[in-house]
Curated annotation (Swiss-Prot):
Source organism: Cutibacterium acnes (strain DSM 16379 / KPA171202) (Propionibacterium acnes)
Name used for this protein in its record: Oligoribonuclease
HAMAP family (alphabetical): Oligoribonuclease (MF_00045)
Gene encoding the protein: orn
Cystines in this chain: none
Function: 3'-to-5' exoribonuclease specific for small oligoribonucleotides.
Amino acid sequence: MLVWIDCEMTGLDLAHDGLIEVAALVTDGQLNVQGEGVDVIIKPEPQWLDHMNDFVRNMHTTSGLLAELDKGLTMAQAQDQVLDYIRTYVPQAGKAPLAGNTIGTDRSFLAKDMPKLESYVHYRNVDVSSIKELARRWYPRAFGHSPEKQGNHRALADIQESIEELMYWREVLMVPSPGPETTRCDEIAAKYQGFLTGAGRD
């Protein structure tokens, strides 16, 4: 399983900003979405809104998120709702990696504002943006034809687009299942083992 999460924040400063929307979708290993997912809006601390710059304020106004914040949940309520959904499909903590786009930023805010949720997922991340950056350098044609994002800056739509993007990268970049024959895998492993470190080479 993979736990896909996207967050909207009042900004990117961990000391002065915070989460205002969190959405989650769980997929199996083949990227099939489990259930309906969850999307929660959080009523922010007043000082977070005061710190919001014009760019972020305009972005959240255009998306409609800013107008919904007054009716948002508390951070604790929001965390519990997201965890309840995840636990339905991932009943054991520390098993499913966190997935998304540029997920390190989201994870940092989750660790600050929703530590129970952040610690529930595996410490490893599946970051679609890493594959995109490699495609940009190694497969420019595939990069140039990747799915166009709508960029509406709402958490659930952003997750759905991230899953769609990984589906695309899997089909255009990844070796079809079940992959190369065992002997071919061994040949390639021998070719690169110690290529830089010298370890394991005669």
